[in-house]
Design a protein with these regions (language model features):
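N-terminal secretory signal peptides that target proteins for export/translocation
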Residues: 1-4
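Phosphodiester-processing cores and adjacent nucleic acid-binding clamps
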Residues: 20
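Bacterial N-terminal signal peptides
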Residues: 7-17
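N-terminal maturation segment of proteins
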Residues: 23-239
Length: 239
């Protein structure tokens, strides 16, 4: 994942170079990197991450105006604190990390001036297909993985409604897709409207619950998964 690779490069300072810069400047930089990573995990939004690498992990991201403004304000805070760091007091990989992190935050700042978030679907893919296809590429090794996944399933209707609101906002503003990019989009939704919950790609993880999970718990997880897909996911996709 691009974001994780970038973070790895940013945090590999002492392993790659013998940094001799100002300790306080270095400490503040690493404090910013840690805080930003923690917030990204909390928000479940990773700037410039390949959407094909999307993996739900508990509560899904908020995509409404309040959340967007919150993330924008946090990014501005990061830029302000970066500006207070004397880059001349950094050396080696620390200076590279500073420059790269600042570039990413400046790019994120500019991204808020565009309206691409109002177009979360096309004829080929969208937030709903990334969500539906993610489980096939996720590792479910224990009970906690399934419990977090159930939280994601339960939260999908809210996540879906917020994206529908974005689409409506685009209509209200007079913004529309180029016809070719949206032609046939309904099929990507129809693919999720299965007759039986067990046919859903979202149920597949419950068919491969590892033996490390007790039999009674496996049955309970399967029942919960079926209920959420039937009563929450499928109705949400019909909206």
């Amino acid at each position: 994942m691009i974001y994780q690779l970038t973070r790895f490069l940013l945090l590999s300072v002492s392993l790659l170079f013998a940094a001799s810069g100002n300790a306080s400047e270095r400490e503040e930089l690493h404090r910013l990197l840690d805080e930003h990573w923690a917030r990204a995990q909390q928000e479940q939004i990773f700037f410039r991450t390949d959407p094909d690498a999307y993996r739900p992990d508990g509560r899904l991201a908020q995509v409404d105006a309040e959340a967007r403004n919150r993330r924008r304000a946090f990014n501005e805070e990061m830029l302000g604190r970066l500006a207070a760091i004397d880059a001349e007091g950094l050396s080696g990989q620390d200076r590279i990390s500073y420059q790269l992190f600042r570039y990413e935050r400046q790019a994120e700042r500019e991204s808020y001036d565009y309206w691409d978030h109002l177009f979360p679907i096309t004829s080929l893919f969208g937030y709903h297909t990334y969500f539906a296809h993610a489980p096939a590429n996720m590792a479910f090794s224990g009970l906690q993985d399934y419990q977090r996944y159930l939280v994601s399933l339960e939260d999908f209707p809210r996540y879906n409604r917020e994206h529908i609101a974005l689409l409506q906002q685009a209509v209200d503003k007079g913004y529309t897709h180029y016809c070719g990019s949206i032609n046939g989009y309904e099929q990507t939704i129809a693919d999720q409207l299965v007759e039986e919950a067990r046919q859903s790609s979202l149920y597949q993880p419950f068919e491969r619950i590892p033996s490390t999970v007790a039999a009674a718990q496996r049955q309970q997880l399967q029942q919960q998964g079926l209920a959420l897909i039937e009563k929450s996911i499928i109705p949400a996709n019909r909206e």
